[in-house]
């Protein structure tokens, strides 16, 4: 939609990976719609994921005992946060939609050694293990950028969070197949896996959450299947601004 601004937070090491293709097609499709696209390529930026004393410029409010949350909150109010944090906060503040493009791996298995799955010798992707969570560099981005004062306050969270007029969407790839992420699958229902991130982090800051875009097991998929994953994402983006946010406190999560 013309005039909309989109931030893509990209957390993958290899530009030629399927995550790179998903990012590229998102940029192309949204640009065709007249959107302004900004990309934070965290690995290319060498983004610092650690939350440390260096995030506060100048004197601490309590030099005798360092409390990161308190000091960053005070630094935000005094405009004395490190520039890499404020640069990212500006990108978030200007965005109507934030897309998190990430690769998730759910265990330590080397899928290429399983004979029942086809392997691809050329252009094969290798990844760190993320253990049902986001890559450390993206976790660090959230820890440092979505700080108190900028993204939320007490009170001022969930539906009252400071980013309540923005949309967020997780676009991610997995190591396991779709069947593994079902209620009867070995890894469990994927909705439970994403709930802490979608609700506990993003919705806590006020984001309205769009349904995730999940590309299952591209590493063991055929070339045609991988192309279909990218095409499916491109097709969805054509009507992304018409989508309604998902319910972040659904009854199924609480066994109702």
Predicted segment positions?
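Helix-loop-strand module that forms the ligand-binding subsite of alpha/beta enzymes
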Residues: 76-198
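Phosphate/nucleotide-donor binding subsite
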Residues: 45-91
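N-terminal beta1-alpha1 ligand-phosphate binding loop
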Residues: 2-35, 40-43, 224, 233
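Short catalytic/ligand-binding loop motif for oxyanion handling, primarily in non-cytosolic enzymes
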Residues: 16-17, 46-49, 106, 131-135, ...
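Glycine-rich phosphate/pyrophosphate-binding loop and the adjoining helix
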Residues: 180, 184-256
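Short amphipathic alpha-helical segments
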Residues: 26-29, 146, 197-203
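Hydrophobic/aromatic beta-strand patches that form the interior of the parallel beta-sheet core
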Residues: 7-9, 38-40, 99, 124, ...
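Aromatic-rich, lipid-facing transmembrane alpha helices and their immediate juxtamembrane interface loops
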Residues: 1, 73-75, 254-255
């Amino acid at each position: 939609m013309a005039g909309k601004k989109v931030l893509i937070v990209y957390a993958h090491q290899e530009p030629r990976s399927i995550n790179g293709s998903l990012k590229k097609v998102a940029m192309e499709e949204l640009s065709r719609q007249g959107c302004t696209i900004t990309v934070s390529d965290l690995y290319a930026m060498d983004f610092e994921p650690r939350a440390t004393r260096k995030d506060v410029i100048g004197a601490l409010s309590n030099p005798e005992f360092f409390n990161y949350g308190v000091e960053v909150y005070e630094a935000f109010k005094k405009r004395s946060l490190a520039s890499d944090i404020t640069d990212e906060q500006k990108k978030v503040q200007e965005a109507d939609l934030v897309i998190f493009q990430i690769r998730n791996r759910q265990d330590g298995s080397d899928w290429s050694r399983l004979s029942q799955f086809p392997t691809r010798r050329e252009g094969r992707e290798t990844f760190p293990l993320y253990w049902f969570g986001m890559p450390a560099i993206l976790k660090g981005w959230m820890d440092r950028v979505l700080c108190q004062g900028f993204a939320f306050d007490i009170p001022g969270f969930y539906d009252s969070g400071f980013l309540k007029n923005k949309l967020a969407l997780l676009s991610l790839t997995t190591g396991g197949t779709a069947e593994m992420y079902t209620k009867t699958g070995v890894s469990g229902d994927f909705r439970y896996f994403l709930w802490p991130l979608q609700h506990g982090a993003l919705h806590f800051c006020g984001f309205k959450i769009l349904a995730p875009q999940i590309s299952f097991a591209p590493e063991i998929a055929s070339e045609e299947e991988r192309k279909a994953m990218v095409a499916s994402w491109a097709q969805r983006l054509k009507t992304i601004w018409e989508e309604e946010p998902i319910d972040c406190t659904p009854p199924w999560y609480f066994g109702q």
